[in-house]
A protein has these predicted regions:
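Structural preference for solvent-exposed beta-strand-turn elements
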Residues: 2-120
């Protein structure tokens, strides 16, 4: 099987984001985004998922950078997987250092879900 790699760029008036990733990597990362906590989270994602991530992001404020990194990361993951099947959803709970981490991921390609639930 060939390596599953994705490269995506996003440029707006507020941000510039470039991501290169390899789903079949070893967890190597090179992240420059100017936001220490976002960098930490992306490096942690890379390390534990073993997805190689190279990322460059800059922008006018943290909110726009985080938002556009998320959009670009999702597009790069979608591009990298190609037609190869991968799990769409996953939930994990992990004790890590002095915290319990709970996460759920759904990599469907839709911006939101709207559900009309009547009051009981």
């Amino acid at each position: 099987m060939s390596a599953r790699k994705g490269k995506t760029e996003r440029r707006t008036r507020e941000t510039s984001v470039e991501i290169l990733l390899n789903i079949d990597g070893t967890g190597k990362f090179d992240v420059e985004c100017g936001i220490p906590f976002l960098k930490h989270m992306l490096e942690t994602l890379s390390r534990y998922s073993e997805i190689d991530i190279t990322l460059r992001a800059e922008g006018d404020n943290d909110h726009h950078i985080i938002e556009d990194v998320a959009i670009t990361l999702g597009k790069a993951l979608n591009s990298a997987r190609g037609s190869a099947p991968i799990e769409r959803m996953s939930t994990r709970t992990v004790a890590m250092d002095d915290a319990v981490v709970m996460t759920s991921i759904d990599i469907i390609d839709r911006p939101y879900a709207e559900i009309d639930c009547p009051d009981p």
